[in-house]
Amino acid sequence: MFGGQQPILVLSQNTKRESGRKVQLENIQAGKAIADVIRTCLGPQAMLKMLMDPMGGIVMTNDGNAILREITVQHPAAKSMIEIARTQDEEVGDGTTSVIVLAGEMLAAAEPFLQQQIHPTVIIRAYREALEDIVGHLQSQLSIQLDVKDKAKMADVVKACVGTKFIGKWSDLAVKIALDAVETVTLSENGRLEVDIKRYAKVEKIPGGAIEESCVLKGVMINKDVTHPKMRRLIENPRIVLLDCSLEYKKGESQTNVEIIGEQDFTRMLQIEEEFVQRICADIIAVKPDLVFTEKGVSDLAQHYLLKAGITAIRRLRKTDNLRIARACGATIVNRTEELTEKDVGTGAGLFEVKKIGDEYFTFVTECKEPKACTILLRGASKDILNETERNLQDALHVARNLVLEPRLVAGGGAVEMAASQLLTRKQVKGPYTAVAHALEIIPRTLAQNCGANTIRALTALRAKHASHTGDGVCAWGIDGESGEIVDMNVKNIWEPLAVKLQTYKTAVETAILLLRIDDIVSGSKKRGGNEPTNPAAMAQGQE
């Protein structure tokens, strides 16, 4: 009866649907392709990638997240791989390259099982179990406690992070900057620890000079000049007032019409405006400040009154800069000048000065007594160098912050991966569980590859070291990223924060699980151009 009927089309005709094993294997290929792009960026001998954006700008970096941000990919699985690098960067600030390499290897480890027609949920169950065991081992057996007061140990950990970057040549300077900045912005109150480096540790880049001139200012630096040329540009122990309102005549919120009949009406209007500005300036002068910062404008008349009172004014600050100055000098940001009181005035700053660096004027509020905000001043030969230095420094700042918030360490140089791999292997569970153990070895293997060592020999020797370890302590044998030799990380002093490693493993395994769960891709609801690949397999080739 229904034999001659047309098949029912549910999907649009220009929509392509792929499902089953083919999709899972394509997802794995896409993940591996992204991991291969990033692999050479791991370790102290990492190569740089030069990327050109659509606007013609050039980015040179070995930061996993920065590279993937610039690459344009089409395959949906590749896009989710890029997303995990961003998550890693936001959460812990370091380990972006490791997480991509590890996620790619976790996917590759699942490929043979899929080809043997093992169901993805079986693989996923084994991966989950392996992840739980890894996290348990890391927290109990493979990590050591760090004393935050031990500055030398803290410096070693940050140095290990910085050593793999472009800034590694100036590692001592970078470590000092990172630790100083984090120590400055650390706020401990009511048993709560807060380290907000994003808001209160601002990085200011000024082209010119040498990288060695970079430093941490115990205060705030902003790219502004005084509003009037005759105002003071150097004040010691200034009294600072911070405003969130304009020092100009305030116009009404709604539209108003004024009818002027005679000349005296016009004169009266001007007089009212003048009196208003005079009143707000009188409110400010009453608390005897030396310095006024406002986020809005300052009229010429207000400048005149403030100059007569010997007060320096700086206008149009960013909200974030105003908050930093408030934290640094102890002032309170005031919204209405009538409400200004003595306790709103900041007296914590030791020096205010305006300096000319290059062609621009910069305002410095420094030598603060108890600054809970700071500015990192970076100098360098070119914009590209400054941008890469800033990216590297952000990683160092995040590592220092992680140590303050969670002071536990694991051995670097692939030692912790090999130790975790051995612990999983000893459990003697067949199948995908063991595949996770082998996948972890990609980190020491890549470190050996990137410095030109004999990978097979190095890995076999490292495996033997870990297999023969029977003591209670952490087995800290790993690959020296500089030479490719096997060294004890206790001696070499290469440690990494536990928080970074935990996040790396969780993200990598969860991503592999997510991509293995996909068995259907419906793509292409809009018409494509003739030169674009239409199937996801072809898309995966487009990212390199």
From Swiss-Prot:
Q: Where mainly found?
A: cytoplasm
Cross-referenced Gene3D superfamilies, in alphabetical order?
Answer: GroEL, GroEL-like equatorial domain, TCP-1-like chaperonin intermediate domain
Q: Which GO terms describe its biological process?
A: lumen formation, open tracheal system; protein folding; terminal branching, open tracheal system
Q: Name one GO molecular function term.
A: ATP hydrolysis activity
Any one annotated GO CC term = chaperonin-containing T-complex
Q: Where in the cell is it found?
A: Cytoplasm
Task: Write down the Pfam families for this protein, in alphabetical order.
Answer: Cpn60_TCP1 (PF00118)
Highest taxon of the lineage:
Eukaryota
Chain spans, region Disordered: 525-544
Q: List the disulfide bonds.
A: C368-C374
Q: Which UniProt keywords apply?
A: ATP-binding, Chaperone, Cytoplasm, Disulfide bond, Nucleotide-binding
By sequence similarity, the record places it as follows: Belongs to the TCP-1 chaperonin family.
Q: What does this protein do?
A: Molecular chaperone; assists the folding of proteins upon ATP hydrolysis. Known to play a role, in vitro, in the folding of actin and tubulin.
What does the annotation say about its assembly with partners? Answer: Heterooligomeric complex of about 850 to 900 kDa that forms two stacked rings, 12 to 16 nm in diameter.
Q: What is this protein called?
A: T-complex protein 1 subunit gamma
Query: What species is this protein from?
Result: Drosophila melanogaster (Fruit fly)
Identify the gene encoding this protein. Answer: CCT3
